[in-house]
Amino acid sequence: MPEPARPAPAPVPVHGTLLAFDYGEKRIGVALGNSITRSARALEVIPNRSVEYRFTQITRLVNAWQPVGFVVGMPVHPEGEDQPMIKLAKRFGNQLHGRYGLPVTWVDERYSSIAAQDAGATDDVLDAEAARIILQQFFDESHA
């Protein structure tokens, strides 16, 4: 079966809240940011127990924060090759787009977890801190 197409990158809305995700098979880090202030903060870690549980928790966050879009980290190998997790992250991003109808933007996250560890993030918040780094990178690099 062919792999679902990646959602087309969408421009950052002029203003609004964005949710960012560091997708993992066991945990999903979530960060919150604002395109006006261009700042991000770690929000929480969602245990990736099942599709139903995952999206119940994400729906709770979408309802609470009313984002205008999502940023999803794409796990790319340091030499630019696809990591095995990239298919799962793509599927997750496609599911976000399909369920909520919001634009999904992809960010190279190859060093986000290492940067979170280097910043002193503890295991219980490591994935949320990695999501914060992904979102801050999104603000800093490509969307002036």
Curated annotation (Swiss-Prot):
The record's annotation in SUPFAM superfamilies points to: Ribonuclease H-like
One GO BP annotation is: rRNA 5'-end processing
Residue ranges annotated as coiled coil are none
- One matching Pfam family, short form? RuvX
- Entry EC no(s): 3.1.-.-
Compartments where located? Cytoplasm
> What would you give as a GO molecular function for this chain, any one?
nuclease activity
Matching InterPro entries: RNaseH-like_sf, YqgF, YqgF/RNaseH-like_dom, YqgF/RNaseH-like_dom_sf
Q: Does the keyword Nuclease apply?
A: yes
Record keywords: Cytoplasm, Hydrolase, Nuclease, Ribosome biogenesis
- GO cellular component term of the entry, any: cytosol
Query: Which family does this protein fall into?
Result: Belongs to the YqgF nuclease family.
What is the purpose of this protein?
Could be a nuclease involved in processing of the 5'-end of pre-16S rRNA.
Q: What is this protein called?
A: Putative pre-16S rRNA nuclease
Query: What organism is recorded for this protein?
Result: Ralstonia nicotianae (strain ATCC BAA-1114 / GMI1000)
